[in-house]
Amino acid sequence: MEFSIKSGNPEKQRGACVVVGVFESRKLTPPAASIDKASNGHLSDLLRRGDMDGKAGSTLLLHNVPGTLCDRVLLVGLGKEKEYRDKQYCASVRNALKALNDTGAQNAIVFLTETPVAKRSVAWRIRQAAMLGRESAYRFEQFKSKKNETHPRLRKLAFTVEQKNELALAEDALRQGQAIGEGVALARTLGNLPGNVCTPTYLAETALQIAKEHAIACEVLERADMEKLGMHSLLSVAKGDRKSVV
């Protein structure tokens, strides 16, 4: 997955899909309102007809929205505005990513990161979105001879900020989120590997490789080191294994 940061009007974005939020009682977020204005009330008309009410967990995919340059517009329900906190924000981003993966769109511009979250900064919103984006892209297919590809995967995600002076801060937050996301993905992969592959030696070699790539220190403990440190519980678990503890 390729991530980037953007700033601009949603109706002027070229791409496969633009993602904007709607609160309960059909209240449009500023990016959604911008698209609504450009489309002469197209979104408002749909909401008044009952196509969507903004409840948390709901999504509505629209094609060829008048006044926009993108192929699709995805409306994401954010729930009650007064209750929009960390949990609701992360849930809305997850719902958006799931809906995007179901559409077959290969790129998207996500404006949910512009929606304020109580006591949270722009950097926090971007960081969380990047982590969730990496999470949605995770696949463990190392031992699959045939991959189940029903449609193209989402490959590029752009997260937006409202002000251009927020771009540098958002870029830093994006890098942090990507790094955390990659770490989580590695941990999941190591956990998914069978024991005869992910041996203590394999773990040690993986750690050493990461240390080499990022110029950080890494110390691998041998059996004698563990005995000296009193790590008897760990040693007793591995005692019957033909593989070395490290």
Q: Language-model segments: what does each one mean?
A:
Residues 1-246:
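Short amphipathic alpha-helical segment within the helicase RecA-like ATPase core
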